[in-house]
């Protein structure tokens, strides 16, 4: 095992330990834990992300935002990058930065097309931006893609057709909207 692999294994174990200790009702100890972990692994994008996630869970979105931006700029990869993009997009939405949130979540949707959670959070951001047609279209498409039952399968073409229609309405509204 290489030194980099050993370091990653140690970091992964430490992150798992932090999650095992986490109390969502009292995030201060978790923030302290992940901040200390970041001191051990300075500039490691995964450690940076975990500090951001702890602040986010505590409701301090503004502080979380900076950590998410640093983690992404530091080269976060794989599923951790997907989770970071999702949480960053959600944080931007909570901060009222709807267009930025949609941009980040569309990037995540493009890079991780099989992530249902990204699609749901994109729909939330579209809704928050008063783009309900696009939000419902995303959820209808998700239902058609992921819910397989005789009842849904029977109406899949209608769900997809309605999703396409709603996207058309949203696109028309976006073209008419003042820039």
Question: Residues of each region from the PLM?
Answer:
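Alpha-helical segment of the N-proximal tetratricopeptide repeat
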Residues: 8-36, 40, 50-57
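Start-of-helix register in tetratricopeptide repeats
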Residues: 12, 46, 79-83, 117, ...
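TPR/TPR-like (Sel1-like) alpha-helical repeat modules
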Residues: 73, 127-150, 164
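Alpha-helical adaptor scaffolds
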Residues: 46-110
């Amino acid at each position: 095992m290489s030194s980099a692999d050993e370091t990653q294994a140690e970091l992964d174990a430490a992150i798992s330990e932090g999650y095992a200790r986490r109390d969502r009702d009292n995030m201060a100890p978790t923030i302290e834990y992940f901040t200390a972990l970041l001191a051990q692994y300075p500039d490691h994008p995964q450690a940076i992300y975990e500090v951001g996630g702890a602040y986010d869970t505590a409701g301090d979105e503004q502080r979380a935002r900076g950590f998410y931006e640093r983690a992404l700029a530091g080269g976060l990869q794989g599923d951790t990058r997907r989770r970071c993009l999702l949480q960053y997009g959600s944080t931007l939405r909570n901060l009222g930065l709807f267009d930025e949130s949609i941009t980040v979540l569309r990037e995540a949707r493009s890079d991780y097309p099989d992530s249902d959670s990204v699609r749901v959070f994109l729909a939330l951001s579209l809704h928050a931006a008063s783009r309900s047609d696009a939000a419902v279209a995303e959820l209808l498409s998700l239902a058609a893609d992921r819910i397989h039952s005789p009842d849904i399968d029977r109406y899949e073409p209608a769900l997809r057709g309605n999703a396409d229609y709603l996207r058309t309405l949203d696109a028309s509204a976006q073209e008419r909207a003042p820039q």
